[in-house]
Amino acid sequence: PNSKLMPTIPEKFSRVENKFLKKSYSVYDDLPKMKWTFLKDEKKYNIFKMNYSEVKKFDVGSKLHKRFPGQQKFKAYKPLLAELIDSVENYVKIHRLPKPDYNIETKLIRKGDGEFQPSPEEFVEIIMAIVKQKKLEKRVIIQSFDIRSLQYVNKKYPKIRTSLGIDEKEDFENNIKDLGFKPTIYSPYYVLVGKTLVDKCHAAGIKIIPWTVNSIKDIEYLKNLGVDGIITDYPNLMGQIDLKN
């Protein structure tokens, strides 16, 4: 929303200093009425095995994390994807803002299918059911570090944009070869990005949007390399960046 020259994707919707969630989301209006459960051993709880009524009981905003000194402490629950989309759409409509695109990631672990997560195919279908219901096909990007998810999207929904997440120092050519097609976006860990990688992506007709970039210095460096956007925990930093030059 800050500039067409440098799109910014908030990581987990600005997971730390999210004044937008705190002050603008009607989905949290009933928080004081709820009973909250605090966990000492989170490994005993498998969210994949829970129904949403159980998930909604957990307070995900009150526990502070030392990595994020600017975190604001407030009670919050995990909203459903459809609920989140409705809230965002309502907010931009009220404030007469441009409609945003949605970068939705399938978080999958190796050998976790059926125990800690749905299969990639099922995961994508769950997401796409909401995307189609909300008529967001032209405004959604499916991102994943799991190539199975993206391969399924490309096969079943070829018009949907895809973003390949990269967290290992493997060369660009092999990553694209393993995927089997050119994604819309190549999204590597930001420390892996150099001018050569940016040029390779652009030569292949692929946008490059690194993650997770949380300092002005790193944002400026990547901007000067010519990246197409960034993923960050702090989209508010973009107000301090000269995007025109």
Task: Please describe what each predicted stretch is.
Residues 160-245:
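C-terminal active-site rim and adjoining tail of enzyme catalytic domains
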Residues 2-147, 151, 155-161, 181-183, ...:
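Metal-dependent phosphodiesterase/phospholipase catalytic core, i.e.
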